[in-house]
Amino acid sequence: MIVERIWTGNAYRNYNYLIACPETGEALAIDPLDHEKCLNTARVKGWQITQILNTHEHHDHTGGNAAVVAATGAKVIAHHKAAGKIAGMDRGVQAGDVIKVGKHIELECLDTPGHTMCHICLRSHTDEPALFSGDTLFNAGAGNVHNGGDVNALYATFVEQLARLP
């Protein structure tokens, strides 16, 4: 599994991610707000973005979807309850579902409500453990609950799921 972290350099201070299979060159774009940087990085690396995963429905995570889909034909994946909130969603996922990238990469979906009630994190099923946490968890703390979230749900996500991860 190759992970390319892309700094957006915007006021939101977001990171976008490309997860690529080294064997096939297929890539998953996670929250590709800065579609130009995501598309350019994939092109330079020789990867084909085939899927987009939105961790939740906020615009700073979904705003680049249309441009990436137009350029690549990628399928949009998000929480199953976000179907009416994320335009062009092709696949709804829930806890335990697996997103496959290329031949061997498997990312398990965790239903992690709190920041929003349609939030998911991805847990890597490779030799390199990783958690792609969207706005649930930051290096300096937890995500906020200001725009459609719930503090009790966020607390439960931390206690019942994230704290138990290896």
What is the predicted function of each stretch?
Residues 20, 58, 91, 109, ...:
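Short, flexible coil/turn micro-motifs enriched in small/turn-prone residues
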Residues 2, 15, 89, 95, ...:
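Glycine-rich, flexible loop/turn motifs
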Residues 98, 116-166:
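Metallo-beta-lactamase
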Residues 8-9, 20, 66, 83, ...:
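Short secondary-structure boundary/capping segments
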Residues 12-13, 27, 33-111:
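Active-site HxH/HxHxD metal-binding segment of metal-dependent hydrolases
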Residues 22-24, 85, 138-139:
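Short glycine-enriched loop/turn motifs at secondary-structure junctions
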Residues 1-47, 122-134:
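Conserved beta-strand hairpin/beta-sheet module of binuclear metal-dependent hydrolase folds
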